[in-house]
Amino acid sequence: MAQDVLTDLSKVRNIGIMAHIDAGKTTTTERILYYTGVNYKIGETHDGASTTDWMEQEQERGITITSAAVTCFWNQNQINIIDTPGHVDFTVEVERSLRVLDGAVAVFDGKEGVEPQSEQVWRQADKYDVPRICFVNKMDKLGADFYFTVRTIEERLGARPLVIQLPIGAENDFIGIIDLVEMKAKVWRGETALGEKYEVEEIPADLADKAEEYRTKLIEAVAETDEALLEKYFGGEELSIDEIKGAIRKLTVASELYPVLCGSAFKNKGVQPMLDAVIDYLPSPLDVESVTGHVPNKEDEVISRKPSTDEPFSALAFKIAVHPFFGKLTYVRVYSGTVESGSQVINSTKGKKERLGKLFQMHANKENPVERASAGHIYAVIGLKDTTTGDTLCDANQQIVLESMTFPDPVIEVAIEPKTKSDQEKLGTAIQKLAEEDPTFKVHLDQETGQTVIGGMGELHLDILVDRMRREFKVEANVGKPQVAYRETIRRKVEKVEFTHKKQTGGSGQFAKVLIDLEPFSGEDGATYEFENKVTGGRIPREYIPSVDAGAQDAMQYGVLAGYPLVNIKVTLLDGAFHEVDSSEMAFKVAGSQVLKKAAQAAQPVILEPIMAVEVITPEDYMGDVIGDLNSRRGQIQAMEERSGARVVKAQVPLSEMFGYVGDLRSKTQGRANYSMVFDSYAEVPANVSKEIIAKATGQ
């Protein structure tokens, strides 16, 4: 049995490692696990042997897709690490990890600085107010520039970096760091086998001035936020190491400053001081404010829970994974109280009872069973039947619903056709399991063709889902070409649209009459629909109102122009009529559906398409070709800048124009340019494109 869970929460850190796709995040995590004694042999991403990349596809592709939770120990402290993917297609993994973390290590590539993906992940961390420290990695790489990277953190992220280490040497001569808090050099001599030992020495003479300059900046930054330290500093007194660390910690936990460290995880340099910084500066569960939620079915009744074992039990399910032996694993963050394995709790989001089977603390895909789950920790649970991502589990007698998570809709879809009858059955199981694991994976049946259509966040995302269907669920299927996930919406408000549903066949008939307003709507947190009931005086019995709402939502699945989902609308039910005998829930559902279609047709419907933020890095010589090509793809150039000797073009381009871009870019620039893209927003398509989309969808 590994070390048990720590009950002193001041010694616990729940952290994520976040970064751009190739900044060296998984390698950094591997080194952490090695130095904290979890691994006896270092796993390399490029050998396909890393601990946190435990799915076959991850090991083959050398990228991290699922955020594995890993527990390790450092200097009597417990660190629970979530390794998040940096590839844009897997934003959902990053988003749900950040929701349950207390702090994070942002890893940057020392040559590239802040890249588009790092920017996106940084913004997601801002959304959840996650304190961070920055690790400038790959300092051994040709062209690595620590000071440039620090500048990009300030300029591109608008953050306040606090440099607490400087590199000694660069590229092949990178041998260690200067610790500006302790004013000592930490040097890894030679290629020490695995970097376990480093020497603490005096600062090299040629770097003494630079160290003094950055030390002064550091002291001034921390002193100006604390009156007592400021007086001491201006009085000419030295601040103690503990005072400096305490002040840095306070500023980091408040997300006012972001300490910046450096190293080379691959060359085993700088990882242990980074672990010290995780303990010294990132928050423990006790530093984080009480978690708030509401009473079930009463959203305005806010309640909170302190991160204490004395409070009633509450936890958030943030990830579902399928384990080869145990089946469904649910990862939970426990916010308050304790619970024994085998206990019965309630899923307050769904109002269903659940029994906790076995509880584990995970080490990538190895399990360490524990008897009890307690506040401040992350666990994997077996045996939960109805719980999905974002659900709250809590004490049945003192219920709370914690804030859930919002996930983006898919931007790309493919049709998938099973090859045989038995594949058809297996496909059903595969889709259900994968959808449980991944809230951004959506499935629907194309009403025209009868094909199953799956949607996701990008081509790589769908590739990997299809690959998992083949490998894990043994589904053989033909996969169509990627299609863009268009949406429909309306431009203007229409008032008092009426529809009467009437059917008279032998026996009891059907009758329902409804009157609605329909208007454009954009809600908070990405909500795309609202229903308001203004019916008075029992014109429609109360029990039928939800049926009108349900009918309207059904009709939203297929828009009126080209059959794409209808979004960003508000329905107000004004009036109606019913019949004592012939009215029913079904009749009002049909009326709700039909009146919405009728109203949408009159409300200037338009088609929306996903727009991607594209960043191309190219040598100067190819700038003209790159810009011309982006313009021909209906792209809008947003900015151009210089970065490490290359030119960077930022543009917004419709996703439909970006298929096959990687090959075109390669041939236009002789393979010397590269690009990345992230989903930005939905925008109305031009009229000529709209005509083409409608013609294609309606077969005209």
Curated annotation (Swiss-Prot):
It is found in: Cytoplasm. Its main location: cytoplasm. GTP binds at residues 19-26, 83-87, 137-140. GO terms for cellular component: cytoplasm. GO terms for molecular function: GTP binding; GTPase activity; translation elongation factor activity. InterPro entries: EFG_II, EFG_III, EFG_III/V, EFG_IV, EFG_V, EFG_V-like, EFTu-like_2, G_TR_CS. Keywords: Cytoplasm, Elongation factor, GTP-binding, Nucleotide-binding, Protein biosynthesis. Residues 10-286 form the tr-type G domain. One of its GO terms (biological process) is ribosome disassembly. Belongs to the TRAFAC class translation factor GTPase superfamily. Classic translation factor GTPase family. EF-G/EF-2 subfamily. Catalyzes the GTP-dependent ribosomal translocation step during translation elongation. During this step, the ribosome changes from the pre-translocational (PRE) to the post-translocational (POST) state as the newly formed A-site-bound peptidyl-tRNA and P-site-bound deacylated tRNA move to the P and E sites, respectively. Catalyzes the coordinated movement of the two tRNA molecules, the mRNA and conformational changes in the ribosome. This is Elongation factor G.
